[in-house]
Amino acid sequence: MKRTTNTALKKNGSTAKPKTQPTVVERPGSWHLARTETERRLSDFEFGLERLAQAYYRWKAACLAAVCDVPLTGDDVAVLNVVRMGDEPKRLSEIGQLLNRVDVPNLQYATRKLVRSGLIETEGSSSRKETRYRATATGHSVTEAYAALRAATLPPMLEALDGWAAKSETTSIQLDLISSLYAQAAQVAITRRHQP
């Protein structure tokens, strides 16, 4: 039998009612993530962010595919470019920190894929924790070709956007702040999950 809050209460002989969340009346045509004006604005922002993220990762995969025959995802390209950043070897933990990623198994998969493809190589200890990754000569030339195609494609488009230069720095700072808010909100959600 599936254990629900009600069955747990019956089994314990308790007459307490399960906690209920305050109800918000939905407007006709609205939905569960946009019941108030603030929620609607947040939902619009989040959908824009989702579309941007998906377009960005498709762009990275397409840009790399134009200069290299190795089939990589946008996530793989992000790992490759971070490994190449500053031309200094990096540990998996550093790659995760730079990309704000905690999904270590997926990062390990991406680095193994990039090693097998000959774009990066390992250096140092055989310990997974201490292993560092660096771009190979092939990886270096592929990332250079990627950077050249990116420079020839995106900057001219962005410069055509009115006010792009002035807004880009402010937007970058705001995105970092919003990223911190989402991280904090995730912590709050986890603590609430364990409350009775």
Which role fits each region the language model picked out?
Residues 101-116:
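Short amphipathic alpha-helical interaction segments
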Residues 112-169:
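Charged, amphipathic alpha-helical coiled-coil/dimerization segments
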Residues 48, 78-82, 141:
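Pre-recognition alpha-helix immediately N-terminal to the DNA-recognition helix
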Residues 61-102:
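N-terminal helix-turn-helix DNA-binding core of bacterial DNA-binding proteins
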Residues 1-70, 119:
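N-terminal leader segment of winged-helix/HTH proteins
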